[in-house]
Swiss-Prot record:
The lineage of its organism: Eukaryota, Viridiplantae, Streptophyta, Embryophyta, Tracheophyta. Ca(2+) 2 binds at residues 56, 106, 110. The keyword Transmembrane applies. GO terms for cellular component: cytosol; plasma membrane. Residues 1-30 are annotated as: Disordered. This is Multiple C2 domain and transmembrane region protein 13. Expressed in incipient leaf primordia. Its cofactor is Ca(2+). The chain crosses the membrane at residues 568-588, 688-708. Gene3D superfamilies: C2 domain. Residues 21-139, 171-293, 326-453 form the C2 domain.
Amino acid sequence: MAANKDEFSVKQISPKLGGERGARNPYGPTSLHDLVEQMEFLYVDVIRAIKNSDVDPGPCDPVVEITLGNYKSSTKDLPVGPNMDWNQVFAFDKTKGDVLSVTLKDRLTNTVINKSNFKLASEIPTRAPPDARIAPQRYPLRNTKTGFYLMMSVWFGTQVDEVYPVAWFSDASEVSTCVINTRPKVYLAPRLCYVRVTIVSGHDLISTDRNRTPSVYVTATLGQVTLKTEVSSGTNPSWNKDLIFVASEPLEGTVYIRLIDRVDDQHEERIIGKLEKKLSEMTPLKVPSSAPALFYDIEVEPAGDSRRFASRLKMKLATDQAYHVAEESIQYSSDYRPFVKGLWPCLLGKLEIGILGATGLKGSDERKQGIDSYVVAKYGNKWARTRTVVNSVTPKWNEQYSWDDYEKCTVLTLGIYDNRQIFKEDQANDVPIGKVRISLNRVESDWIYACSYPILKLGSSGLKKMGELQLAVRFVYVAQGYARYSAPFRWLLPKAHYKSPLSVYQIEEMRAEAVKINCANLARTEPALRNEVVWDMLKPKTNTRYSTCDMRKVAALAFFDLFLYWPSLIVWLAIYLVVVPCIVLVGLSGLHKFLTRKFWNKRENPRSPLIVNDLKLWKLESPNLDELEEEFDSFPSSVSDVNILRMRYDRIRMVCQRPMILLGDAASQGERLYALLTFNGDDQLASFYCWLICVLVALCWYNIPMWLWSLYPIAYWLNFTPLRNDMPCGVSNFFRRLPTNEVLF
């Protein structure tokens, strides 16, 4: 089914944001919530139940119930402290009722002990930071003769309030003890570092069988990852093998090194030595360099083996702190900083984002009317998670977060997920709904982009719109002068990546390991950011449909060939009259646009959205369902139908044939150029022609003004009448006849 282009477009919205930027320190943390709509809550901070010393209430297990309109929250699922205290804040939408009812019950008998009502309009104060929190007090509940008072505080506040991240919201009152999984949180993932173990050589190695020459390979283990060298024979084997691991700060792990002797062809193996080195004992490389090669005595296996000399292993052990460990695909990278902080570039600016809400969300479970959704935003090593809005397809979050930005050529990633951790009986994995990515290169400084972004999900059944995510984005420059204007010209990656580059295979292998380490680190937080969420946020981009998309780009270049064969003289004159004045005025037009854009039109909102979804470019207007099914197929393939596999094999052969033909043609042209430069061939006339053409070109180059040379491509593109010829020119014929190596195949 053809996709509707307008359905997947980005729409500008006009939310009632919290106000203008105002005066504040751009170097400090963001405290104003001016990128979100203000949400007013009724906060109830329940501290404890206090016994009346004059009355003995007898055995009692107190429970507090708070009711506003149709919403009810209770402390029955909260642990009770030794002094009957809870210290829990409850939050209600103030528009859901006019009277707040607080009831103290006995859990054992389910009877009401005390009860009190508050009128929202007259009896509850309003408080906003930086005002201090309202002190709790003993509220005069009725029936205090039963022996209890209730210590609590009540006030009106917004999402700016410091209790917002820990409050128990009324829409999540049914999630009981799993309420912690619904709270907003900011996570700082530990920074990652490469650990390079270079196995140089072994010395005086002895096999367990003294009559046999050892065939040894070395394994190194850090955490759950084990790498090994090739097998090398002899008592003094040589490897010169780099084993690279990924470790997270504070670099407290241990590398376990084993020397394993392969006894026979049946791969019987025996450990002949071992060694342990802590990461803190390795050489920290903070500049592009190499660690010194040192000899290390190994512990001989089996234990108790006595010998007059020690076997040694020559190694280079270092923590490469000058590299940036990639955890994201390079196309979606949000950070390029190395591990060591001294090599970081200067702070460029502040990225601020307001997560307003979503509309029209669609979940994987069609039987469920609402969705328990939350948003995760990732930039650099800082992750932000909004609170979970329970059972709603149009959630409102209105939460604002900020990041320090060191490089503008980066991408902000936001994912929206269905929370499956809020009920004890439903402890499944969180389900991804979709993602939105925003390139900071498209964000102009000091503008507020308030847009509704389509949440797109590509599956085996085609492209689906899972709803829309409403965001407000702003970037503010902090750096000034030279630091700001030289930023586009500095190195994108740290210097070590250019001095001692890693291979593409190594980078991808380390990236997969970095994702696992981040999953493990963030899973240990409270509340945990689950593994499936981290993996989905860091998932690399898919490469399917690249062949068809890139061939469209090649076909676009062929469009210019149409200009060489204008259908009539009238069309040629019309194009000539339009193009030539544009070429003359292009410099003035560009300068005028730059000046008006930067200095005069600064008061206008930018027109271009941050994301442009080109369905034609990605072949998603009329997607091939079999290609999509192949893209989301497992590896190895789960398809058992031989005919489908044969069809896919033939299709990939055709796809691979196109670039091979292009590469063959390019190689042939290169061989002809090489033959021309080296004067290969038996025809001496070709050498003479080449010499003559070079002389003529040199004479023309030194005698014809440069502005005339610049007119030649324009004249060739416009295809003036004297230049029209359907037959190839003589120079092309001459070049075509030069020898190639095609005849050898």
